[in-house]
Regions:
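General small-molecule cofactor/ligand-binding pocket signal
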Residues: 156-159
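AMP-binding/adenylate-forming catalytic core of the ANL superfamily
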Residues: 22, 38, 43-44, 66-151, ...
């Protein structure tokens, strides 16, 4: 069986699990924190005990990614743990919203972050660069037809180009700073 959105199955000698924030294994097709261990997996970071404490727990390495394993053992990446938005007590994965926005023919790039909210704890904000004109209300309507209501961005900010690092990856911390200024 082939799963084009999967990164594949774990290699021989590496155990991969999807776990809750309490380190409890989750059932198949449930999004959670990825952890893995094996003979070739380090037990810590060299000369960095603070980072080691954050990333290693009871012999498992936590790379900071969210994902799920299907029934066949294929791993699907769903985003970064630190990027997860908790809105009204519900975990929301920005990657799903970003992919939805990217499916609109007018959108060139998209990044989703959170902003504090008195009502929900966190609210969803999307930063978008366009390749064709579209209004923020039309993009929000597009999201409403493709996402659950609680995943629809409250605000869409347009930019000519999203900030990127030297590797071409969008720098969400810069977007957060721009939003708070």
């Amino acid at each position: 069986m082939h799963f084009p959105d999967s990164v594949g199955r774990p290699i021989f000698g590496v155990d991969v699990q999807i776990v809750s924030e309490e380190h409890q294994p989750l059932s198949a097709n449930t999004v959670g924190r990825i952890r893995y261990k094996g003979m070739a997996v380090s037990s810590g970071f060299y000369n960095d005990p603070e980072s080691s404490l954050e990333s290693f727990h009871e012999g498992w390495f936590y790379p900071g990614d969210l994902g799920l394993l299907n029934e066949e053992g294929y791993l699907f990446l769903k985003g970064r743990f630190k990027d997860m938005i908790i809105r009204g007590g519900i975990n929301i994965y920005p990657l799903e919203i970003e992919n939805t926005l990217m499916n609109n023919h007018c959108v060139s790039e998209a990044a989703v972050i959170s902003t504090p909210s008195k009502e929900f704890g966190e609210e969803i904000v999307a930063f978008v660069s366009l390749k064709a004109p579209i209004s923020s209300s039309d993009l929000i309507d597009f999201c409403k037809t493709h996402l659950a209501p609680y995943k629809v961005p409250k605000l869409i900010q347009f930019m000519d180009q999203l900030p990127k690092n030297s590797g071409g990856k969008i720098v969400k911390s810069q977007l957060s700073k721009m939003l708070n200024n």
